[in-house]
Structures are given as C-alpha cells and as structure tokens.
Amino acid sequence: MSWIERIKSNIAPTRKASIPEGVWTKCDSCGQVLYRAELERNLEVCPKCDHHMRMSARNRLHSLLDEGTMVELGSELEPKDLLKFRDSKKYKDRIASAQKETGEKDALVVMKGTLHEMPVVAAAFEFSFMGGSMGSVVGARFIRAVEQALEDNCPLICFSASGGARMQEALMSLMQMAKTSAALGKMQERGLPYISVLTDPTMGGVSASFAMLGDLNIAEPKALIGFAGPRVIEQTVREKLPPGFQRSEFLIQKGAIDMIVRRPEMRLKLASVLAKLMNLPAPSPDEPRESVVVPDQEPEA
C-alpha cells in the first residue's frame, strides 16, 4: 500500500450539509441571494436594490391591519364553471389547481379590521390565483367590501395585482367592470374615502375599472400599470415605447396616479391620509411589521 492510500484510508468522509428549503431566495431584479427571514422582515422588498417582490393577499392584509382585528368577508363565495369553458384545460380544473396551489377560493381576499385603531375594509388580490384575474367571485367580493364599508361608515382600501378580466368567464367577467364601478358610486355619494393601491402588475379590465377610480390612487415603485401590455402596444403601433413606459414612475410624471409609496411606508401613509380625510387625529409611527406566512384558518363569514 502506498503512502497516499494509507492517508486516504484514515480520512473519514464528511457528512453532506443539509440546507432546508426556503431558507434562501433570489431577488428577481439584482440577482442577490437573500435570507428569507430578512426578506420577510422587510415586507418582501429586496434590501439590496429595493425591488418590490409580489406579496400574497393574506400577508399583505395582515401586514396592514391591526393584529387581532381582522375578520374575513365573502369567504363562502366560490367560482362556478357556468359556461363549461375549456381551452387547453377545463376551467373547473384550472380553478381546482389554483385553489390547491394558493389555498384561496378565488383571486380577491376581503377583510374588515382597524388601521391604527381606525375602522377600515381592505381587499387584496392574490396574483398567484390565475394571474389575479377578475371573475364573478372577485366582483362579488369587491361589492361585499363596498357594502361593508357603507354599513360601517368607514374607508375602503384595495390592493390591485391582476392581469385583467378572466377570459374563462367571458361576458360575466366583463360585467364586473361595470358592477364594481357602480358600487363605488355609492361610496362617493356617502363621502367615504376609497383608496386604490396599484401593485405590480395592475392590467386589463381591473385597471380599466375600480383600480383607477380611487379618491387617491397610490402605486408601489416600478409597478406595471396599464390596459394592454407593452409588447402588444409595440406590435400595434409599430413603434418603440419610451423607457419605463407603463411603470409607476412614468405614470406619475403624466399625472395618471397621485403618489408612489414604498411598501414598508405604506401602512403609516394610508393611516395618515385616511385620518385627514376622516377628520381624525394623525396616527403615531409604529414598529416595523414583517410579512408572515399566514397559517390556513377557517375564515369568518
């Protein structure tokens, strides 16, 4: 036996390090590898480049509303395949797949609660559910949110993240544009504030209806906001679009939105604006709140 073989025989093999899944993630913008817990503390905003990653509807609402005050509305509403629609896959199968993947029944989650002790109703889109597309259930839940705000005489906040109307529901989906817009007219008649927060992306029938009808339209940084996508527009007009076209920074220069607010500052900004609109005392800054993985719970109707 050679001296090299004698040394090798005395070396014990090391155990392969096991790293649990989900501990690290990668920023889609700068490519930086990030510690998942740090990213959650920063509300899914990259601490290196300030890129605002997509956030689940429940985590967004839980990071906005005061703890222990949240009650879900419209959770009993579920989508139905009334048209027996089928493209490359049956619509009912797409619904089942999206429900299994996200744990949600449809693409909009509505809750009532308090924001800095101020009663509010808040809605948020779950983009992972069929691209946050708007169907009959999304419209019905949004109207439920409006009705609850009217009943409680309180403001309504909606966080949009949608690709637009859900093609599998055809005309029933397009009807929601008119229904939701008409419902907001009742908020205006009562003088109750409706704040629309546009997140990445807010497109199609959602941007063409209630997402742009806020008394105040706020956007997150670099959010894609528009009706048709940039690629479709370029192919139609056969011209190169200007840099940053349809991004929130471009839109605020053109007067299409009112302000851009970073996600970690959103809770206090919304509370401050609503306090002014409702003639209430200005809220005090609170401790930074992190995004948490919300466990599955039986929601209250």
From Swiss-Prot:
Keyword Nucleotide-binding: yes
Keyword Manganese: no
E.C. designation(s): 2.1.3.15
UniProt pathway: Lipid metabolism; malonyl-CoA biosynthesis; malonyl-CoA from acetyl-CoA: step 1/1
Region (Disordered): 280-301
Pfam families noted in UniProt: Carboxyl_trans, Zn_ribbon_ACC
Binding site for Zn(2+): C27, C30, C46, C49
Main location: cytoplasm
Domain CoA carboxyltransferase N-terminal: 23-292
Top-level EC class as recorded in UniProt: transferase
Keywords from the named record: ATP-binding, Cytoplasm, Fatty acid biosynthesis, Fatty acid metabolism, Lipid biosynthesis, Lipid metabolism, Metal-binding, Nucleotide-binding, Transferase, Zinc, Zinc-finger
Co-factor binding comment: Binds 1 zinc ion per subunit.
GO cellular component, one term: acetate CoA-transferase complex
One Gene Ontology term of the molecular function aspect: carboxyl- or carbamoyltransferase activity
InterPro entries: AcCoA_carboxyl_beta, Acetyl_CoA_COase_Trfase_b_su, ClpP/crotonase-like_dom_sf, COA_CT_N, Znf-ACC
Gene Ontology BP term (one): malonyl-CoA biosynthetic process
Zinc finger extent (C4-type): 27-49
Catalytic activity: N(6)-carboxybiotinyl-L-lysyl-[protein] + acetyl-CoA = N(6)-biotinyl-L-lysyl-[protein] + malonyl-CoA
Lineage: superkingdom: Bacteria
Location(s) in or outside the cell: Cytoplasm
HAMAP family: AcetylCoA_CT_beta (MF_01395)
Quaternary structure (record): Acetyl-CoA carboxylase is a heterohexamer composed of biotin carboxyl carrier protein (AccB), biotin carboxylase (AccC) and two subunits each of ACCase subunit alpha (AccA) and ACCase subunit beta (AccD).
Role description: Component of the acetyl coenzyme A carboxylase (ACC) complex. Biotin carboxylase (BC) catalyzes the carboxylation of biotin on its carrier protein (BCCP) and then the CO(2) group is transferred by the transcarboxylase to acetyl-CoA to form malonyl-CoA.
Family recorded in the similarity comment: Belongs to the AccD/PCCB family.
Name this polypeptide is given: Acetyl-coenzyme A carboxylase carboxyl transferase subunit beta
